[in-house]
C-alpha cells in the first residue's frame, strides 16, 4: 500500500512503472469468504489498484509468471504509458518452475482507428465554428515524439496554445 501515491502519480502522468508486491500464501487468502482479512496483512491490492494501473494481476499460478511479467512490461511501455502491478503470493514465490513450460505473452496486432479521418474532420469543424478557440497541449505530445507535428499544427491553426504545468 505504500506505493499507491507513486502509482497514482505515474498513472496521471503516463509514466511507466512496474510494481511487484508480495501476498499471503494462497491457502491463507480469503477467496470470497466474506471476511476482510484472513492471512497476516492480507489485502486484495489488485482490486485497490485496478483503477490507477494499466494492468494489475494476482499471479496465482506459478506457470503463468512469464505471461504476467511480459504482459505487464508490454502494457507499461506501449500505447499510453503507465504503471502496472503484479501481486505474488508467498507460496508462488517459493514454487519451483520448469522454465521450458512457461507460457509467454503475445500482444495482439494494434488496431487501426478506422474512424480517425471522420474524427479529425469533426474537430476541424468545431475549431472553425469556435469564437475563441484555444489548444490545450499536454505531455502526451512529448511522450509520443510528436513535437514537430504539434509545432506544424499550431502554425497551421494560428490559435492560442495553453500548455500544462510541469
Please provide the spans of the model-predicted regions.
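N-terminal alpha/beta PP-like core and its mobile active-site loop of ThDP/TPP-dependent enzymes
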Residues: 1-166
